[in-house]
Each structure stands twice: as structure tokens, then as C-alpha cells.
Amino acid sequence: METLILTQEEVESLISMDEAMNAVEEAFRLYALGKAQMPPKVYLEFEKGDLRAMPAHLMGYAGLKWVNSHPGNPDKGLPTVMALMILNSPETGFPLAVMDATYTTSLRTGAAGGIAAKYLARKNSSVFGFIGCGTQAYFQLEALRRVFDIGEVKAYDVREKAAKKFVSYCEDRGISASVQPAEEASRCDVLVTTTPSRKPVVKAEWVEEGTHINAIGADGPGKQELDVEILKKAKIVVDDLEQAKHGGEINVAVSKGVIGVEDVHATIGEVIAGLKDGRESDEEITIFDSTGLAIQDVAVAKVVYENALSKNVGSKIKFFRI
């Protein structure tokens, strides 16, 4: 038997945002219903970064994403994040595919934001604010475009050049957009934060009633993007409670005792599955705390793999003498 090898370029050609959103939504639902396995992430920590092992089993596949985070890599001509996915058959354990997962990590994160807003934002949301205009902002925008009729985008980034580039991207797609201060960008229907900040970049007084926030940036202990006062008055929905408590947007507030895990309303999977309510009024502030789950990675890898087989894309290698 042979294992399919898929490069980043090939992976990018094999899955759309629509496919990713469908896969991620179903993954969240299955996990909430107890129909998926996902052990905790395993970390190897080094002086200049870390490696993380992220395993999961769902939808007839098992998979492991092996991903690094080395902030100093750009100085060496390497990406900060590089990821591989090994996709296995649960029946035999055979490695069906080894593929790039760098692109799909960004894609599934964006997809999760779109799905969360679908269930938690006001249906008539039209003004979208972005705090942080790096790569992930584009994936968030593309997912949100598939759920809402976006009338206006307000963009803020500490690097004005990045904000201007994002605004141009929006305008090229027929969306009215402008560079704004963080305070003005926060005054919107849906706010997306994608920064690596360790101190709040969004103040409580900036956020109006009825706002939905996709809090994407916090991905480790000590990171936070939102004033804890926002968390205290919002309906908080997480992708996974344990991961969110460890390194999501709520981690600082929970560790300081400002809020407790009992203040988390639900997981997004529980909302999708109908086990918990989503938005219940036009006045409440809702927050989606996204940490990124292995179930998302396996769900999108399934789509990539099956599309590759049907389109005869990729190369094959025989690892074992069998």
C-alpha cells in the first residue's frame, strides 16, 4: 500500500472556504455529541519556540497535526508556523496521507470564525471591525462574507501598512473599507481580533450592546486581547473549555479569578447541536473564544484527501515493506 503525499500548493487547490466551513461546523457538532475523540495537545518547548502534537479521530479518519511556533523564524528565512498532517485509517492505522497543514490551519481557523458568527452574531450585522490585519484577518473575512452581507469594514493594525493592504483587499471585492483607530474599529456589529497581544487591545467602553466578537488571537497562557470587563458582561462561547482555560481569550481572566469556568455559556459545538442557546437577544454581547482544535484539522484533511483521490492529485510513496 502507498501513502499519498500532498504539498502546500496541492492542498490549497483541493479545498474551498465553503468546504472548510461545512467540515468545521460538522466537526464541532460531532464533538459536542461525543462522537469524536480529541486528547489534549502535547507540547515540546524549546528556547526559541515549541512543537505541538494535535491528535483527533472523527468522520472515519484519525489524524495527527504536528505544528511548530518559532517567532524568530522569519529572520532565518523560514515561516513562524509550519505544520504537517498525518491522516490514518482507524481500522488499520495505515497512514493514508501526509500533507501540508499550514494552509489548512489558517483556513479552518477562519472557517470557525464564520461558523461562530453565524450562530452568535445578529443576523442583520453589516459593519465589521478588524483589530489586527495579518494573514488570519483575510481568512476571517472570507468566511464572514459567506454568512453576511458585509456593508462596511473598519480596519486597525499597529502596522498601518498592513491595515491599508487589508482595506485594499476589501475594496477590490466591492466592500466599503477604511483604516480606523482601534476604538472606532471596535464600534461595529461583528469584531474580529487576531493579534498576539498580552495586554488588552479592546477596551470595554468601546464595545456596544449587540456586538459579537471573534476572539482569535490568544493562543497561549498570558495572552489576551479583550478588557476583562467585556468578558464579565458577555455571553462567552468557546471551542473547547480546557484549551480556552489554558490559553484562550479567557485564560488570564480565569487565572486571576475575575471570571470562572462556570461563566462560560457553552461550546460552539453545543450551540450548533442545539444543546445550548446561541444569541438570545439583539442587545447581548457575545464572544467566541477560538483556540483551534485538532478535530478541525482532521475534518478539513478529510476533505483534502478525498478531493485529491477524486482528482488524482499528489504523489505516492511506499513507506513500508508490505
UniProtKB/Swiss-Prot annotation:
> What EC number(s) has UniProt assigned to this enzyme?
1.4.1.1
Is Cell wall biogenesis/degradation there in the keyword field? no
Question: What UniProt keywords are attached to this protein's entry?
Answer: NAD, Nucleotide-binding, Oxidoreductase
Binding residues annotated for NAD(+), in chain numbering: 108, 135-136, 157-159, 217-219, 223, 290
Q: Name one GO molecular function term.
A: alanine dehydrogenase activity
**One cellular component (GO) term of this entry:** cytoplasm
Residues annotated as the enzyme's active site: 65
- What SUPFAM superfamilies does the database record attribute to this sequence? NAD(P)-binding Rossmann-fold domains
Which one GO biological process term can you cite for this protein? alanine metabolic process
The entry sums up its family as follows: Belongs to the ornithine cyclodeaminase/mu-crystallin family. Archaeal alanine dehydrogenase subfamily.
By its UniProt entry, which NCBIfam families does this protein fall under?
A: ala_DH_arch
- State the protein's name: Alanine dehydrogenase
| Species annotation | Archaeoglobus fulgidus (strain ATCC 49558 / DSM 4304 / JCM 9628 / NBRC 100126 / VC-16)
